[in-house]
């Protein structure tokens, strides 16, 4: 009974991972001399990010791929130059922010290439996905099922944190919207009051003017 329940929990855990544990994995070509191409993602504060890129080609083919990882807070997280094969960059986010992984393929010489380009495989792991669970399992002497459950626990905690962040952001936007509506309402009342006051003043002025001319 206990073993079947454990197996069921393991199956549910793996099923959950299929839907929740989604890392960004892309494969694309980047032509030489066409400018920078960036992939954007979002990360919460203090989350580990591991960026793995596999770049095709070989040195001396007249192309040079440079990589740049930066976030919207102005932080640089790596600028590998002339990337060939697999390269990996890891960093921990300083805050809730978006970050860009950018590639630029520079043509340094033609060498008879008609359509110079490089193929790039990009894998971005964030949070629990970025941790080395094989190493954790070996160090803490965990069973596979315990490792899976630990991983699920961390992923669920990250999902909860992200939902809390979205809820707080929604509340902030709602408060800003309500504050703006309140200001617009009072501005409209003030404008109407000014128009009414201006109309009354015009009536009084015209009445006094016509009386001075003995027209009324």
Swiss-Prot record:
<feature type="signal peptide">
    <location>
        <begin position="1"/>
        <end position="25"/>
    </location>
</feature>
<dbReference type="GO" id="GO:0005793">
    <property type="term" value="C:endoplasmic reticulum-Golgi intermediate compartment"/>
</dbReference>
<dbReference type="GO" id="GO:0006886">
    <property type="term" value="P:intracellular protein transport"/>
</dbReference>
<dbReference type="GO" id="GO:0006888">
    <property type="term" value="P:endoplasmic reticulum to Golgi vesicle-mediated transport"/>
</dbReference>
<dbReference type="InterPro" id="IPR015720">
    <property type="entry name" value="Emp24-like"/>
</dbReference>
<dbReference type="GO" id="GO:0030134">
    <property type="term" value="C:COPII-coated ER to Golgi transport vesicle"/>
</dbReference>
<keyword id="KW-0653">Protein transport</keyword>
<dbReference type="GO" id="GO:0000139">
    <property type="term" value="C:Golgi membrane"/>
</dbReference>
<feature type="topological domain" description="Cytoplasmic">
    <location>
        <begin position="207"/>
        <end position="216"/>
    </location>
</feature>
<keyword id="KW-0732">Signal</keyword>
<dbReference type="GO" id="GO:0005794">
    <property type="term" value="C:Golgi apparatus"/>
</dbReference>
<comment type="function">
    <text>Constituent of COPII-coated endoplasmic reticulum-derived transport vesicles. Required for efficient transport of a subset of secretory proteins to the Golgi. Facilitates retrograde transport from the Golgi to the endoplasmic reticulum.</text>
</comment>
<feature type="topological domain" description="Lumenal">
    <location>
        <begin position="26"/>
        <end position="185"/>
    </location>
</feature>
<feature type="domain" description="GOLD">
    <location>
        <begin position="36"/>
        <end position="126"/>
    </location>
</feature>
<keyword id="KW-1133">Transmembrane helix</keyword>
<comment type="similarity">
    <text>Belongs to the EMP24/GP25L family.</text>
</comment>
<keyword id="KW-0813">Transport</keyword>
<dbReference type="Pfam" id="PF01105">
    <property type="entry name" value="EMP24_GP25L"/>
</dbReference>
<dbReference type="InterPro" id="IPR009038">
    <property type="entry name" value="GOLD_dom"/>
</dbReference>
<keyword id="KW-0256">Endoplasmic reticulum</keyword>
<keyword id="KW-0333">Golgi apparatus</keyword>
<protein>
    <recommendedName>
        <fullName>Endoplasmic reticulum vesicle protein 25</fullName>
    </recommendedName>
</protein>
<keyword id="KW-0812">Transmembrane</keyword>
<keyword id="KW-0931">ER-Golgi transport</keyword>
<feature type="transmembrane region" description="Helical">
    <location>
        <begin position="186"/>
        <end position="206"/>
    </location>
</feature>
<dbReference type="GO" id="GO:0007030">
    <property type="term" value="P:Golgi organization"/>
</dbReference>
<keyword id="KW-0472">Membrane</keyword>
<dbReference type="GO" id="GO:0005789">
    <property type="term" value="C:endoplasmic reticulum membrane"/>
</dbReference>
<dbReference type="GO" id="GO:0005783">
    <property type="term" value="C:endoplasmic reticulum"/>
</dbReference>
